[in-house]
Amino acid sequence: MGSLSSRVLRQPRPALAQQAQGARAGGSARRPDTGDDAAGHGFCYCAGSHKRKRSSGSFCYCHPDSETDEDEEEGDEQQRLLNTPRRKKLKSTSKYIYQTLFLNGENSDIKICALGEEWSLHKIYLCQSGYFSSMFSGSWKESSMNIIELEIPDQNIDVEALQVAFGSLYRDDVLIKPSRVVAILAAACLLQLDGLIQQCGETMKETVNVKTVCGYYTSAGTYGLDSVKKKCLEWLLNNLMTHQNVELFKELSINVMKQLIGSSNLFVMQVEMDIYTALKKWMFLQLVPSWNGSLKQLLTETDVWFSKQRKDFEGMAFLETEQGKPFVSVFRHLRLQYIISDLASARIIEQDAVVPSEWLSSVYKQQWFAMLRAEQDSEVGPQEINKEELEGNSMRCGRKLAKDGEYCWRWTGFNFGFDLLVTYTNRYIIFKRNTLNQPCSGSVSLQPRRSIAFRLRLASFDSSGKLICSRTTGYQILTLEKDQEQVVMNLDSRLLIFPLYICCNFLYISPEKKN
């Protein structure tokens, strides 16, 4: 709304007003002294005052003409009040302008027509819009027109959104419902209303959830709200695996899913094989969007559907078919080396025949050479932080702790003889390199020292998937001797909100040096 200024003329307080009148009259009303008053402890009956005892003498300390300390103090107080700025919001002003000028259209000097509706507005208010400011100040023919036909090329904009956008020029604040924010944002961008665009962005960031995230992400990209786009991507990285949802899988585009699966910040639950399983379910829902079952039924239905496809395309991986080719770029971001390191997972991915066998063959070869280096080439693990390698090739795994208590676990898979046990107890998270103390299903390295590069993240979410609290160790190198354990995180009890989600990234061996 345009700048407004006002002066507020204040009435003097009653007591001060009466004293001022007494001063102008040259005196004050006095009652005759009686009783103790004559003894030197009289009472003051000045107009506008309460009866009060005088400490000594028969004159009145409250008399406006008395040259006393009390009078000086009162004068100082009045002076202080006169020089103290006061702020008073005229609540009715904005409402009056909005009602009279915008809703009633009084004294309108221009009409805006759009989408079959007409608004009686005022150029002085419309100039707050970059769109109309350029129109009126330039050499456009519309600058002298009283009726302007506004073309609306954006299908997101409707009459209600234009009503809110135009109305925002006549008022200080606008209430935006999450269900209407995209339409209002579209109108605000068309009219170049920076303040309203910013308010839409804040509303979107505050209301990201499973129902809004995909729409917000798309709209943020369309209208250039990078901060909203980033917020949506963060929400998806945190919730895609931790709070799987059928409708969300249907809405997620190939481009967005590619970003999520390729990120080392994806909050994984369990292991890489679970990312593959989630991708398989997502791809099924992209191809069969009419499916309408529950999350519990989804994996079974997915496997049945892909089983039928294998019969139709015998000898060909699904990603090599015409139906599957659009999804290749997403599945390329799977870290297959952490899937084939577990026997059960390797068998499933071979049987599914979703991923081309050539992809798997190259990974088998890569891991075989890595194992030989670990066994025969004095490989003791990473010795320095290689962020690029960690971001692109680290093992991703996680665990949900439903309530406080004691937990001890290991993530499945062959990790080059490094059997890592993770313990949560008494607000501590502990890593232990197990060699001989506890049974292990695979072979265990007996090297005196082994190192790993890791990052541990911890998070809690509210019912909408919004991050409540989080902590991270950042990327670190940890060297452990046989059966040695190390506290990697000490948790503040104030941050312990269950369920608690733990996610880790690991590198067990150094990347092979290229000759």
Curated annotation (Swiss-Prot):
Transmembrane segments: none annotated. The gene is GMCL1. It comes from the Eukaryota. Residues 67-76 have a biased composition (Acidic residues). Possible function in spermatogenesis. Enhances the degradation of MDM2 and increases the amount of p53 probably by modulating the nucleocytoplasmic transport. GO terms for cellular component: nuclear matrix; nucleus. CDD domains: BACK_GCL (cd18495), BTB_POZ_GCL (cd18305). A motif (Nuclear localization signal) lies at residues 49-55, 85-91. GO terms for biological process: germ cell development; spermatogenesis. Residues 11-29 have a biased composition (Low complexity). Pfam families: BACK, BTB. The modification Phosphothreonine is found at T68. Interacts with TMPO-beta, TSG101 and TFDP2. Interacts with EMD. GO terms for molecular function: identical protein binding. InterPro entries: BACK, BTB/POZ_dom, Gcl-like, SKP1/BTB/POZ_sf. This is Germ cell-less protein-like 1. Keywords: Developmental protein, Differentiation, Nucleus, Phosphoprotein, Spermatogenesis.
